[in-house]
A protein has these predicted regions:
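Short secondary-structure transition/capping motifs
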Residues: 1, 31-32, 45, 60-63
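Charged, often Cys/His-bearing segments associated with DNA-binding zinc-finger transcription factors
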Residues: 1-30
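Ser/Thr-centered flexible coil motifs
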Residues: 5, 35, 198-200
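A cross-family signal for key residues in well-ordered alpha-helices
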Residues: 13, 43-44, 159
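Glycine-/proline-rich flexible loop or hinge segments
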Residues: 23-28, 50-57
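Short, amphipathic alpha-helical "recognition" segments used to contact nucleic acids or chromatin
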Residues: 35-50
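Short, well-ordered secondary-structure "scaffold" segments embedded in the functional core
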Residues: 52-257
Length: 257
C-alpha cells in the first residue's frame, strides 16, 4: 500500500522518528490513533496511490480527519527525510558531464483551482505544474527540476535554470520538439508549413525518438507514484512539499535497487 517494502519502511520510520520534536508514542496520556509506521504507510501510500483520504480512513478504521491530519503532518517530514536521496543540481552535473543526456518536460496534474489561471497548460489541455526531467541513455533519472506553473513551456523552464547548466556540460543532449531553438539539444525536425517532411527527415525524427525513448519510460516510472499522475487534490500551498516527498520516496526506493 505504501509503495515501500518492510525494510524500506523500517529505514524511513527511523529517519522520520529522528526528525520528530517529541516521540510519536510518549508512553503516557491518550495514545495516537495510528502508530508511526501506520501513519507513514498512509502518508506514503497517499503519494503512491493518490486514493482518497476516506478510503485510507476505512483501511485503518479511523476518521477521515485523522488521516488528513497525519498526511499533512508527515508529508513535510518525509520530504525532509528523503532530501539526501534526491539528486542535487551539482550531483546531476557531475553525473552528466561529458555523457549523453536525455531531457523531457512533463506535467504534474492538479485540480483547476479558481483564480489560478497560470496553472493551465495549453499543451496538455489541463491544469498542473511542470518540470524537466534529465536521464541518461539507460533511463536512469539524474535530475528533476522543481515544479513551476503549467503555463510555462519547456524552453521557459530551461532558460537560466539548473537544467540548462547541467545539459550544457553534457557530451550531447536529445530532446523533443519543445526544445527546438537551442544550439545544444538535438531535436526532431518540425514539419514545415507548406510541405510534408521528406523521407530522410522522417527517418531522422525516428532516430531521435529512439534515443529519447529511455527518458519517456523514466517519466512513466516516476508517475507510478500516482500523486504525480492524477489530479492533486490537497490545498495548492501543500503541493511543493508533497511533490518533493513523492520524488524523495522514488529515489529512496531506487537506492535499494
Amino acid at each position: 500500500m505504501s509503495g515501500l517494502d518492510a525494510e524500506q519502511l523500517d529505514e524511513l520510520e527511523d529517519y522520520v522518528a529522528e526528525s520528530l520534536e517529541e516521540p510519536w508514542d510518549k508512553g503516557n496520556g491518550r495514545p495516537r490513533e495510528l502508530t508511526l509506521r501506520e501513519a507513514l504507510i498512509a502518508a506514503s501510500g497517499y503519494a503512491r496511490n493518490n486514493i482518497t483520504e476516506e478510503i485510507w480512513a476505512e483501511i485503518f478504521d479511523v476518521d477521515q480527519s485523522t488521516i488528513s491530519r497525519y498526511i499533512a503532518f508527515l508529508t513535510p517530514l518525509i520530504d525532509k527525510a528523503t532530501t539526501e536521496f534526491r539528486p542535487s543540481a551539482e550531483e546531476a552535473a557531475q553525473a552528466t558531464r561529458g555523457a549523453i543526456a536525455l531531457v523531457d518536460g512533463t506535467l504534474w496534474p492538479c485540480w483547476s483551482w479558481s483564480g489560478e489561471r497560470e496553472l493551465w497548460a495549453g499543451k496538455y489541455k489541463t491544469t498542473g505544474h511542470g518540470s524537466l526531467i534529465i536521464a541518461n541513455l539507460s533511463g536512469r533519472i539524474t535530475y528533476v527540476s522543481d515544479p513551476v506553473p503549467g503555463n510555462q513551456h519547456d524552453m521557459a523552464k530551461l532558460k537560466g535554470s539548473d537544467c540548462e547548466i547541467i545539459l550544457k556540460a553534457a557530451g550531447g543532449v536529445f530532446g523533443d520538439k519543445g526544445f527546438i531553438g537551442t544550439d545544444y539539444i538535438t531535436t526532431p525536425v518540425r514539419k514545415p508549413q507548406h510541405r510534408d517532411l521528406y523521407m530522410r527527415e522522417h527517418d531522422y525524427n525516428n532516430q531521435v525518438s529512439s534515443f529519447r525513448a529511455p527518458v519517456e519510460r523514466a517519466v512513466a516510472q516516476l508517475k507510478t507514484w500516482r500523486i504525480l499522475f492524477t489530479d492533486y487534490r490537497r490545498p495548492l500551498k501543500t503541493f511543493l512539499s508533497s511533490f518533493r516527498a513523492a520524488m524523495g520516496l522514488y529515489f529512496f526506493k531506487e537506492s535499494f535497487a
